[in-house]
Amino acid sequence: MSKVKKNEEALSEVLVDVNRVTKVVKGGRRFAFSAYVVVGDKAGRVGAGHGKAKEVNEARGKAKQAAKKRMMKVPLYQNRTIHHDVVGKSGAAKVILRRAKAGTGVIAGGSMRAIFDSLGVHDIVAKSIGSTNVYAMISATFDALNKLASPKSIAIRRGKKVHEISVKSYIQVNK
């Protein structure tokens, strides 16, 4: 079995939204379906995609392929939460993501919960402000996730060592 197949099997898929859309033509109405899917490996990689087709299953398949193409790696703290608080925006939607202590759980609504479950986050507090449109909320959540950075990546970017920028490691080194 190839690596692509193994990765494909490990991905979890969540159908976030399905819409029936209509195109009015001279002869009447043409119906089609629009689907939005979130895909993740529950280990720090997640993506979202949109697909349109005449049948729901075809739209879902197209959305899944689009989500796989748009997958991104998110740095997780102890493989359970995010490293720091962050805010994401998309249009009128605003999302605030806050790290949480172990055992807190996923406190998030709707489409944000689907993203965190697919991502593999176990402890997070998320608040949405403004628009509750599914597309805008997912876009704002991905904007916030793109802003996340681990102490290691920040240290590399600044040309320093991790213990020089991380408060906890600084305290441990200078005890």
Curated annotation (Swiss-Prot):
Pfam families: Ribosomal_S5, Ribosomal_S5_C. It comes from the Bacteria. Coiled coil: none annotated. Residues 11-74 form the S5 DRBM domain. Signal peptide: none annotated. GO terms for cellular component: small ribosomal subunit. Keywords: Ribonucleoprotein, Ribosomal protein, RNA-binding, rRNA-binding. Gene3D superfamilies: 3.30.160.20, 3.30.230.10. GO terms for biological process: translation. GO terms for molecular function: rRNA binding; structural constituent of ribosome. Belongs to the universal ribosomal protein uS5 family. The N-terminal domain interacts with the head of the 30S subunit; the C-terminal domain interacts with the body and contacts protein S4. The interaction surface between S4 and S5 is involved in control of translational fidelity. PANTHER family: MITOCHONDRIAL RIBOSOMAL PROTEIN S5 (PTHR48277:SF1). HAMAP family: Ribosomal_uS5_B. Part of the 30S ribosomal subunit. Contacts proteins S4 and S8. With S4 and S12 plays an important role in translational accuracy. This is Small ribosomal subunit protein uS5. It comes from Rickettsia typhi (strain ATCC VR-144 / Wilmington). The lineage of its organism: Bacteria, Pseudomonadati, Pseudomonadota, Alphaproteobacteria, Rickettsiales.
